[in-house]
């Protein structure tokens, strides 16, 4: 079971490559706006053929990164709802926008694996090499954050000495 949140403004139809391979228990949430609200006939056909559930989220834009903020908020909502139900699916953000790396790092620190992928095909095959720089950066930030947290919790305060 997986959720795929699509930054359609960013990846367009190419981000949907592999949608026909998804399973019945997968869900694709397409975030789009007036800036990117059209698709090819080929993509339309694949969306009709996929077993996955497709949800469309039209985003009203007017401020910079409006779609990104709504996608990030919806991801948090999904994670909360699924955890409340005792379900722990995989989460993928389909984008080429490196701005989502901090979101991935945050959820990883919370024990929730969120991955960034460029299209659904790579999301379906998580061993595929996609963006090693973003993944390496995420690992460095996570390790740095964990080390700082340990220091905060293991260092005695002046009152304790």
Regions found by a protein language model. Give the residues of each.
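Nuclease catalytic cores that cleave nucleic-acid phosphodiester bonds
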Residues: 34-148
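Short acidic, Gly/Ser-rich segments with clustered Asp/Glu that frequently serve as metal-coordination loops
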Residues: 8-15
């Amino acid at each position: 079971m997986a959720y795929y949140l699509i930054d359609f403004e960013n990846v367009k139809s190419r981000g949907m490559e592999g949608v026909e391979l998804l399973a019945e228990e997968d869900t694709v949430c397409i975030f789009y706006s007036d800036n990117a609200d059209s698709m090819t006939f080929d993509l339309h056909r694949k969306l009709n053929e996929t077993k996955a559930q497709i949800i469309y989220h039209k985003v009203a834009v007017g401020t910079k990164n409006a779609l990104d903020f709504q996608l990030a908020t919806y991801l948090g909502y999904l994670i909360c709802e699924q955890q409340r139900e005792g379900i722990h699916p995989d989460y993928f953000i389909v984008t080429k926008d490196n701005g989502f790396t901090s979101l991935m790092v945050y959820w990883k620190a919370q024990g929730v694996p969120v991955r960034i992928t460029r299209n659904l095909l790579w999301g379906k095959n998580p061993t595929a090499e996609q963006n090693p720089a973003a993944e390496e950066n995420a690992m460095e930030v996570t390790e740095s954050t964990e080390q700082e947290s340990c220091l905060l919790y293991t260092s005695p305060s002046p009152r304790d000495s």
